[in-house]
Every structure is written in structure tokens, then in C-alpha cells.
Regions:
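A hydrophobic, small-residue-rich beta->alpha segment in the mid-to-C-terminal subdomain
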Residues: 225-256
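Short catalytic/ligand-gating loop segments at beta-alpha or beta-beta junctions
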Residues: 207-212
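Alpha/beta enzyme core
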Residues: 4-12, 16, 28-53, 60-77, ...
């Protein structure tokens, strides 16, 4: 199956009561870990780059080619979409041109009418190239590449208007935030999600800020129409924790580890990369997308 646009497998998730994972990557090792997990679980997956991560990786073309080449060289058989996460208008257009198979245009920080106008333009350009489109209404809380939101509830009429632009799936604020959730977070507003899905029957909803939401809330949201769940912070924390532990062990056993040449970055980072894969596999289980490739 290899590289595909995402609209068909996201819609299949919506139609059949599970969700697919959108997992953010930051480099080669991160991408390998996500691909290994998806292949092991036989799950369709979106590998996502934020604007900042793509810049870190050398630009959108480099990031796109890295993911595509790894899919080929690793013999990946499950559907993989190369997705831009939270892209500004110009970034969305660039990703369409360099071969991303799915993009998110995030104009949620703009006035509603401008957000809708630009989303429609992005849809026209993307669909002409066979690229799927996600857009957002109701700012997701937290910060993502300079876009700051406090966790709004997406207005129902705005959500309906955004779907009418022709997008393929919708990110809608339901009290979710990016990054670690504070202890006083009140949880997802599932009543508002139900109102959204009743207004948009059968349409796939995207849950951003998937890291740190209790599993039972995620699964309840999936039952109500969420078909894609984004995960980033959870994998970052897993990688950092495993790498820190290895570094502490190295410090305590320096002579032995030096003799084994464990300073080699391929070895030094190995536990962290394994932790990413384990996190992705665990999320796939929670989302119910194992075996759905």
C-alpha cells in the first residue's frame, strides 16, 4: 500500500468506529520507530511534521523524501500518509507542491471568514494533486509552533461552514490542549463533541492533543465520531525518559560502556527509539486501529 493520501482510511475509521493515529516525527530515528510500530500492528498511520520539525529536518522536501524513502527501504506494507501538522497557508501550499499526501491548514487564529476563505483555496489546490486536507475551527489549547490557544469549544456553525469548504476531516476544539495536561484540566467536553457529530453526520473529527488524555475519554470520543487522534508529546516524553535513564546508567558504568562503544549515537539513542515505538504501538491499541491496514 505504502504512501497514500489519508481521506479514505480516515473515513474508514469514522465509518467503522475506530481511530487512526497521527504521530509527529522529528528525525530519521523517530520516523523509523513510527513505521515499525505501524507495520507491527498492521495499522494505517499518518506520519506528521509540524512546521518547526520540518525546518529542523532540513525543510519540507527533505522531510517528505526521508519518510517516503524509509517506507520503501523498510518494506512497509501498511498505508502511510505524509501529513503536515498545523500548517500556515504558505506552508500548506509548499507541502502540496513537494509531495506531502495530506496537509492540515490551520487558520484557526484568523478571523472566521478568512479561515474559511483560505481553507477553500487550500482544498482546491490540494485536491487537484490528490492530497487530503484537514482544517481547524475552535482553537486547540496550548501552543503549537507559535499558534497559542486556550482550549475553546468549536462553534457548531463554524464547523459546518468549514466542512462545506470541501475538507476531508475536521479538527474541532472540544476542550483539548497541546502539550502536557495541567492537573486542573476539566477533561474533554463530550457533550459538545456529540453536538458536533450530530451536526456533521458521518464526518471524521480529529482530536488534537491526544497525549495525556485518559484512555477512556479517548475511546468515548472515538465512539462519538473522532476518527484521527494526534500524538506528539507522549512520544517525546517516552524518548526523553528512556534516553535519560541510559545516560544515567552510562555515567554509573562509564568504563564498561566506553569499552562497548555505547557512545555511538546509534546505540546511545536505541532505548529512546524503542520507547517511541512502544508508545506508538500502545496508542494504536487504544485507538482500535490494529489490523485495519
Amino acid at each position: 500500500m505504502a504512501i497514500v493520501s489519508a481521506e479514505k482510511f480516515v473515513q474508514a475509521a469514522r465509518d467503522n468506529g475506530y481511530a487512526v493515529g497521527g504521530f509527529n516525527t522529528n528525525n530519521l530515528e523517530w520516523t523509523q520507530a513510527i513505521l515499525r510500530a505501524a507495520e507491527a500492528k498492521k495499522a494505517p498511520v499518518l506520519i506528521q511534521t509540524s512546521m518547526g520539525a520540518a525546518k529542523y529536518m532540513g525543510g519540507y522536501k527533505v522531510a517528505r523524501n526521508l519518510i517516503a524513502n524509509l517506507v520503501e527501504s523498510m518494506g512497509i506494507t501498511v498505508p502511510v500518509a505524509i501529513h503536515l501538522d498545523h500548517g500556515h497557508y504558505e506552508d500548506a501550499l509548499e507541502c502540496i507542491e513537494v509531495g506531502y499526501t495530506s496537509i492540515m491548514f490551520d487558520g484557526s487564529h484568523l478571523p472566521v471568514e478568512e479561515n474559511l476563505k483560505l481553507a477553500k483555496e487550500v482544498v482546491e489546490k490540494a485536491h487537484a494533486k490528490g492530497t487530503s486536507v484537514e482544517a481547524e475551527v475552535g482553537t486547540i489549547g496550548g501552543e503549537e509552533d507559535g499558534i497559542i490557544g486556550k482550549g475553546e469549544l468549536a462553534p457548531i456553525e463554524d464547523a459546518k461552514a468549514m466542512v462545506e469548504t470541501g475538507i476531508d476531516f475536521l479538527a474541532a476544539g472540544i476542550g483539548n490542549i497541546h502539550g502536557p495536561y495541567p492537573v486542573n484540566w476539566e477533561g474533554l467536553d463530550l457533550d459538545h463533541l456529540q453536538k458536533l457529530t450530530e451536526a456533521l453526520p458521518g464526518f471524521p473529527i480529529v482530536l488534537h492533543g491526544g497525549s495525556g488524555i485518559p484512555d477512556e475519554q479517548i475511546q468515548a470520543a472515538i465512539k462519538l465520531g473522532v476518527a484521527k487522534v494526534n500524538v506528539n508529546t507522549e512520544c517525546q516524553i517516552a524518548f526523553a525518559n528512556a534516553t535519560r535513564k541510559f545516560a544515567r546508567d552510562y555515567e554509573a558504568n562509564e568504563a564498561e560502556y566506553d569499552k562497548k562503544k555505547l557512545f555511538d549515537p546509534r546505540k546511545f539513542l536505541a532505548d529512546g527509539v524503542k520507547a517511541i515505538q512502544a508508545s506508538v504501538e500502545e496508542r494504536i491499541d487504544v485507538f482500535g486501529s490494529e489490523g485495519k491496514a
